[in-house]
Amino acid sequence: PPASLVLLILLGGLSVSAAGCIANDLWDRRFDREVARTRERPLAQGMIPLQATFVALVLLLLLSLLVVLALPDRHRLTCLGLALLALPPILLYPSAKRWFAYPQMVLALCWGFAVLIPWAATGAPLVGSITLVGCWLATLLWTFGFDTVYAMADRTDDARLGLRSSALSLGPHCVIAVRCCYALAALSLAFAAWGAGLAAGFWLCWFVAAIGMERSTKGLRSTQPQPMAIYGTHFRHQVWLGSLL
């Protein structure tokens, strides 16, 4: 794709991600005060006025809409439809921990649109592509896996506050579930790369990333509390591995 399209996709992805983070902190500001990992967040501390936060959220959503409207004419309507479908789960995800045992599934669905919208923007069909299906599944599985690890950091506080998460729901099977997600994500990416006919250079990166994903779970414990830094390090490893791919 042309560089201009790549830049638009990056801008749209960053603006939507930022909007989702703001929505999350708005929903959870009262709970965040009671959770060790999040109690220092600006909204939890009351350091930012709510009005300013809502203004920032609206501006970021408008920027995201402008990005969609700036996409190529032939594919704009499809991308707009996908963006509108993505909006409800993005805004509702923070509430999912109140009513759904696996809120990380909702987050995974949100990130799945980060595959579908750029794909549609290039004019590629949304049906019948092994590469698209592989990338989409890998994104869902990887997101569910790493956000489950993130939720492991909050298990004690979440249980006390009556909140739900996949880390709590999976209990002693938590780490094995994360490993399975990572293995299936790597396999899905392999199918996607095979369908796209990628060169040997990618497969070297894929191998390093696949091994790295599994190795990053070695120090995790399904039920025993661990230092917060362990979960943060795991999350940063996923960022680097994703960048490699």
Q: Model-flagged regions — what are they?
A:
Residues 26, 30-56, 90-110, 155-180, ...:
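Interhelical loop and helix-boundary elements at the membrane-water interface
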Residues 16, 20, 64, 114-115, ...:
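Alpha-helical transmembrane segments of multipass membrane proteins
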Residues 204-213:
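Terminal RNA-binding accessory module
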Residues 13, 61, 87-90, 111-112, ...:
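Residue-level recognition of pore/gate-forming positions within transmembrane alpha-helices
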Residues 3-13, 29-83, 160-199:
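Multi-pass membrane catalytic core of lipid/isoprenoid biosynthesis enzymes
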Residues 5-16, 131-142, 198-205:
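Alpha-helical transmembrane segments
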